């Protein structure tokens, strides 16, 4: 009797689980398709389990199989977001796609974007990234939610105040000047010019700045750890390419084992470093410390110090500090490297703007024979600022971002229950295609796919027909905390290089922007650097 009851219970449990699974992967997607279709929102049909992923992968593979046409080098949207470009022509700017059985509503109208990130932000949360992505970016500010995110943001924000970042300028400037001197020597030995893949070399500049910002007086120890993190990123990036292979990250392949070992070593190194700094035993007085005290005043707030001193009532746990350090390294390095890469490529493509930017740099900062650009020079480089903004418009580091509805909500109708809005059920994901908004001719005019920094002459808010048409670092409370550091690094680096070199595209350069988490050149960015003759400063 008891045996029969147990069997019946097991059968009922199995039927219950089967019904839940069937609802999740079949009936719920069908209901949601009908729900959105009833509001005029359509999209490619849902396919059992895989959703639209197969079509998305095919569209992206076809688009990236060939480089950009020379006649329209900056019309990158059809290549970079091929699925969006293709389906938008069929379904309009707001349509429904499926990532497996998960619905994603694409939203590219600025007023709806305003609601998602500003006026209705409490209804949306950042979606949970894939574990491979989280291994790359760390479990820090980028992925945290709720009170923990708010606490971390509050603790770390002083590290990105302008006065604090300005103290990094001499260090970053010397790092870039040293890099430029290496290129000059290579050019002199190579007949007056040198070919450089800036996509690789700029990583060193970005690493220098983010290591200084994160570790301050513990720079040397932090640099060792971050070099391990750079190796880990290479392995994790390869794993990300196989993200659609179920369970791949758990397989004990040689590279996965090396990746796991590096992750453990990084954590041990950061824990030791945090322990020394927390103990205040002076153990971090390495060879860099005296230099930092001489050249970077004691008022500098490095991010590690801010976390250690997070407050007596709510000290940040060591594990949280470790994750934040990983986040700083990934986000700080990749965002700045990509911005610098695309900016130099664009100046090499457009020598007229390169000449305008150089004239401004020489007028404000002097030439390479004088002092390096200072914190007082950087705000005066208006043309360079316009060029960087146009770079971020055409080639934003993150081409899209995703939010998740925490509860049922209405967008576009002025509030829940209002006619004309789109009713969005809880757990629906919303994909905001940043690059598509940046390339929308309705917002930017008929030259939206052309390089024209002059559109930013009156500031970013007035560059387009809508003030929220330019969102390279996101919007609202979760806007990228490090955007000021990225712009400072980019301005300073470009100023130093323009003082010293003329830039041109290498004959081997192939214009092929592509996405692997962030936007980067698929075949690298080889450029020709020709040293300039120093002229007397005015």
Curated annotation (Swiss-Prot):
InterPro entries: Cyt_P450, Cyt_P450_CS, Cyt_P450_E_grp-I, Cyt_P450_sf, Cytochrome_P450_Monooxygen. GO terms for molecular function: heme binding; iron ion binding; monooxygenase activity; oxidoreductase activity, acting on paired donors, with incorporation or reduction of molecular oxygen. It is a single-pass membrane protein. Heme binds at residue 480. The chain crosses the membrane at residues 5-27. Induction: By brassinolide (BL) and dark treatment. It comes from the Eukaryota. Expressed in roots, shoot apex, leaf sheaths, leaf blades, internodes and panicles. GO terms for cellular component: membrane. Its main location: membrane. Belongs to the cytochrome P450 family. This is Cytochrome P450 734A4. It comes from Oryza sativa subsp. japonica.
């Amino acid at each position: 009797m008891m045996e029969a009851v147990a069997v019946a219970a097991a059968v009922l449990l199995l039927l219950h689980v089967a019904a839940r699974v069937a609802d999740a992967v079949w009936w719920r997607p069908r209901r949601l398709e009908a729900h959105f279709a009833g509001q005029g929102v359509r999209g490619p049909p849902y396919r059992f389990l895989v959703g639209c992923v197969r079509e998305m992968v095919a569209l992206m593979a076809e688009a990236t199989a060939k480089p950009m046409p020379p006649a329209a080098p900056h019309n990158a949207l059809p290549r970079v977001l091929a699925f969006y470009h293709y389906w938008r022509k069929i379904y309009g700017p707001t349509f429904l796609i499926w990532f497996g059985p998960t619905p994603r509503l694409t939203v590219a109208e600025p007023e709806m974007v305003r609601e998602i990130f500003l006026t209705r932000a409490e209804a949306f949360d950042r979606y949970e990234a894939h574990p491979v992505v989280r291994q790359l970016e760390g479990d820090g500010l980028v992925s945290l939610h709720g009170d923990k995110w708010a606490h971390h943001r509050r603790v770390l924000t002083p590290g990105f105040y302008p006065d604090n970042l300005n103290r990094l300028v001499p260090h970053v400037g010397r790092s870039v000047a040293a890099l430029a001197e290496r290129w000059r020597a290579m050019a002199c030995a190579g007949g007056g010019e040198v070919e450089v893949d800036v996509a690789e070399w700029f990583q060193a500049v970005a690493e220098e700045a983010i290591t200084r910002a994160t570790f301050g007086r513990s720079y040397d120890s932090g640099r060792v750890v971050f070099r391990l993190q750079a190796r880990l990123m290479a392995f994790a990036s390869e794993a990300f390419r196989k993200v659609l292979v179920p369970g791949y990250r758990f397989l004990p392949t040689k590279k996965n084992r090396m990746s796991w070992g590096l992750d453990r070593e990084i954590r041990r190194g950061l824990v030791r470093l945090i322990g020394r700094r927390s103990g205040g035993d002076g153990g971090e007085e390495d060879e860099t410390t005296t230099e930092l005290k001489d050249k970077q005043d004691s008022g500098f707030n490095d991010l590690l110090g801010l976390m250690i001193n997070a407050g007596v009532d709510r000290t940040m746990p060591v594990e949280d500090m470790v994750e934040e350090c990983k986040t700083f390294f990934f986000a700080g390095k990749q965002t700045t490297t990509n911005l610098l890469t695309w900016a130099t490529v664009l100046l090499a493509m457009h020598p007229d703007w390169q000449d305008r930017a150089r004239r401004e740099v020489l007028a404000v900062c002097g030439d390479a024979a004088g002092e390096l650009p200072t914190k007082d020079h950087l705000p005066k480089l208006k043309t360079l600022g316009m060029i960087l903004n146009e770079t971020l418009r055409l080639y934003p580091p993150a081409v899209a971002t995703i939010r998740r509805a925490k509860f049922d909500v209405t967008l576009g109708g002025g509030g829940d229950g209002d006619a004309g809005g789109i009713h969005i059920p809880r757990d629906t994901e919303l994909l905001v295609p940043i690059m598509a908004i940046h390339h929308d001719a309705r917002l930017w005019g008929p030259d939206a796919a052309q390089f024209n920094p002059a559109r930013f002459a009156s500031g970013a808010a007035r560059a387009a027909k809508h003030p929220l048409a330019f969102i390279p670092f996101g919007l609202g409370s979760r806007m990228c905390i490090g955007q000021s550091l990225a712009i400072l690094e980019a301005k300073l680096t470009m100023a130093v290089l323009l003082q010293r070199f003329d830039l041109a595209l290498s004959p081997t350069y192939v214009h092929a922007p592509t996405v692997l988490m962030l936007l980067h050149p698929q075949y690298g960015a080889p450029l020709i650097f020709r040293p300039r003759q120093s002229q007397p400063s005015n």
